[in-house]
């Protein structure tokens, strides 16, 4: 019998204290009775009999309470047994000493007294042993497999306590096996108690030597437990393995360790940190390995060795390439050597001729990534994206350490970064990573001392890098570096601003020269591949810098707009020119829009509004461009554009509000929706080809890139729905694909559903039911008009499944979703009885089977609401039903779901 209302399972501080006091009472009772009453053959026999009987009860409350009492009683008795055992050994030693002192056959009162004491202890120990056996066999053996997980957990927790308290009696396979068996328990709570108990045992070296049999039997199970679906169990399993690794020689094989090392990349931070401790203590700080001593020794010997171990480990981890995750996992254990940036940069700048410590290219790339990850972790003070729910609030001490680290980073890299950039200036990946370091600078350091020469060196290197590279990641990092250093509040602003202006003058000069040649040469109709490449590079550089810096005074807008208009009229420009030109024009308008204020002249606003309209028309035109890349870029820009302007309008700026006159009309909404249908949800036909392994990898990579683009397009469109730029009813077309495309887009559609519901519960519910109604109508139209709806058809089954999945999105809080679910039923009933001729029940409503669809939402109704919905249904139904054939089955099923 399940009685779910008794003290031990009630929540709250009062009942928690009650349980603690109950357990303490049992311990105190035994302690107070241990001198005499405990052995009167009445009290304990009575209590043990009572608890054993109640522990076999069918009533859960009795069984749980008596099992807890019996286990705590045995724990207390074990302590008494331990004390008696100590006293007995002391008495025996005293007896032996006293006996040696007596000569001849003389009797001694003291000797007789000790002998009586020793026998008394033996008698008491026998009594206690009988009590322990009675409780263990009568309660533990029956209850450690109880159906209630709390009871099983109590048994395992206490047996672990007995083993730790009195290992001489309990530390053997006869008792350990129960903990081992329960490692396989279905409930995480029980598995957790097993692991915590084992941690207490494996943490004591004197006990580990007696665990050999248990370790050999259950090691594989423990090694697999960091994969446990319960996070806390996984973390404690990793901590247990750490203890086993430290205290049991060679218990973990190389394969076991390799498996466990990979958990440093897991998204769950506590598990990753536990794995980081395992990796650090087992691999990085291990002293007995070969190649540990660097050839040159010197100042950074220990740190250099650890860094090389870390780099080798990362390169050998074929499954993962996430340096930031690896560093975050090790941060709590290896913070000292991970903050040794002087060692890291010295290792990079050394030449192989000096002492043989130089790294190869792959090692250098990883070390630069490690430097960036450690700098970010030290400066930001929180885990990387995807690990940890939110940024943690730093304590005063942590904040102080963070500021000291930022200062240390700035002082060191101000001098070293220009040298590193000079050394690796031709390597795009290395340079892109190195250029991200200045964003973590404490710029106030520049005002102390005289770092002008270092700043000049940095700006000179960045300028050379921009000239050398066309890689987007390098250019973006360069533009961001200028943006970070160009903070107007700092002492270096004028110096950096001057360098930035000089660089952009040169970039614009190159672009203007190319554009002049382009227009003069038969107005752009004849362009060779070299010119296209140069134009692409020039436009790309300017676009990247325009993203981070306002280039309005260079009059870039007119130049790029002319290219877009030319493409609209003639359609002959290559994609490599169109995409950066489109991006430049977009950024130009964004900077102009950002400059609009309440005091802007009307002429400026009218001019800007005209340009906004022209650009939006260009983007809408490019939605039908022959090149897929141009279509997708135009769509993304248009979505962002609409979102930004809608936000601008929400700021209640009356002048700026005029910018929104054209947004978003029905025609534009239809175009956007049609674009999503064609580019996201329409499946491309795959040709069956015989591909080599290399070609298969490339094909798979292309598919992933294509999926990423589709997700970006869908997310951009869904944002418009969420922020009411596009009508919420447009989401109905998206929701239709929720189940069909769940693996690819399910998270985006679900988030859209959640956000729209948060904005407007009623309208969101109407959109859901509209989606199902449209699918139902399509299903009906696809069937033979003379036949009734086929409930077994694939399309109808898919509709029911979609409705069920929609129902699951409401969660368990029926009160919170009350209005939405009620609206779904109301709209569904009205649709089901649409075009019904009369209410006498003689004519079957054409949409009656739709009731089967909305019955999936019945379990989300509160009981009072079920009665209301049932009453609303009765308005459309005559009682009793004159016809009870199969055609009326949907109505009967729906009514039953409401009456359940």
Language-model features: where?
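Alpha-helical repeat/alpha-solenoid scaffolds of the HEAT/ARM/MIF4G superfamily
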Residues: 1-35, 39-142, 283-416
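Alpha-solenoid helical repeat scaffolds
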Residues: 11-18, 33-43, 84, 88, ...
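Extended alpha-helical scaffolding segments
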Residues: 16-54, 60, 64, 68, ...
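Eukaryote-specific, cytoplasm-facing alpha-helical/coiled-coil scaffolding segments in long proteins
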Residues: 76-80, 92-103, 184-185, 265-271, ...
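Extended alpha-helical scaffolding regions
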Residues: 316-323, 328-371, 375-382, 434-439, ...
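Eukaryotic acidic, Ser/Thr-rich intrinsically disordered low-complexity regions
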Residues: 261-308, 580, 587, 730-758, ...
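Charge-patterned, phosphorylation-rich low-complexity C-terminal interaction regions
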Residues: 205-208, 469-508, 519-554, 575, ...
